[in-house]
Amino acid sequence: MGFEDDIFKITPLAIDINDTRSLHVAELVRDALRNMGKVVAASKIALLGASYREDVGDTRYSGSEIVVRKLTEMGAEIVIHDPYVKHWWELEKQESYPAPGHSWARFFRNQEKLQDSKVENDLQATLKSVDAVSWPSATMPT
């Protein structure tokens, strides 16, 4: 048995969906701004949540990183809020973290300004004068 069998057809598809969901979030933000008569390149966007899951300060393998990188490539100004994260090393030290030449930055344009990114702990300060909010882990109330 292998990937040629019908049993495992869903596995590569699931991996593809998981790998591209962050890019889809950036596209949804772009589309929402467009519907409001705004363009990404002239917008300030708040990202709520930098870590890979709720209530932790670990940003390794965070889907939010790709959202930030794609929106930055589109020209957006990004402000970041996460009460558990003090530094987002993948952005701040992108030339050397996790290792030289291994940053996601190499796949996106206009990433230089992300080195000056600061994670804000004060939600009110983060939301001041933003055009949109990207909250990757948001759920709709039931």
Show which residues each predicted segment covers.
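Structural/interface elements that position substrates and couple domains in central-metabolism enzymes
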Residues: 1-142
